[in-house]
Amino acid sequence: MDKREQYIDKQIIEQIMELRKQLHRIPEHSMQEVKTKQLLMDFLKSHTALEIVDCGAWFYAVKRAYDRVTTENDKTFHVSEVAVEIPEQMTEYKPPIAFRADMDAVCGKDGKPGHFCGHDGHSSVLCGLGLYLDSRKEPLAQDVYLIFQPAEEIGKGAELCRSLIKEKHIGEIYGFHNIPGKPLGTVLVKDGTFACASTGLEIHMTGTPSHAAYPEAGRNPG
């Protein structure tokens, strides 16, 4: 048995591997992820019953938990028109959580986009999570949002998704970055900030140029 099947269904593995190959063939620059977004949305629509919301430059999918119904023993949740009994530990309200993946490609030295940073893999894995959640028979304790973020490479995509976090009162967001070469099933974590990036730095300096033969005519910038 493929060791990966210890963690996830073989059919889901095959589906997300094929999806990654398709995404790898259509890399797009930040804020231009038109084909990428459409492919991901079409995939989830074709393979799941998740609620999908198109937000223009990005989108999200939702796996809903059972809507709560107040009952005498406070253990009954309601789905459509069918009431079901669920375990006692799942009766408490929990705020929604989210999982996030980036969609954009890196701009190569030739100016063309390419998935050199693995965002095709990130988006495929998030779709795989969607497949898994959709296949679950057990009720969820909270709504789960899958956020497909654009423009991670230029630092603009997260800002676009902030409104959803506030509007839906999402309490926690999870994301990851693939790191090839590590053993299968390994998750690397670190206390505190990890892999933070600069948002950019501009320095303005004023001076007077001159020829090296006449340094006294120039003024060092300051």
Residue ranges of model-derived segments:
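Acidic/His- and Gly-rich active-site-bordering loop/insert found
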Residues: 2-116, 120-131, 135-140
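Histidine/acidic-residue-rich, glycine-tolerant segments that coordinate divalent metal ions
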Residues: 83, 104-116, 120-121, 138-222
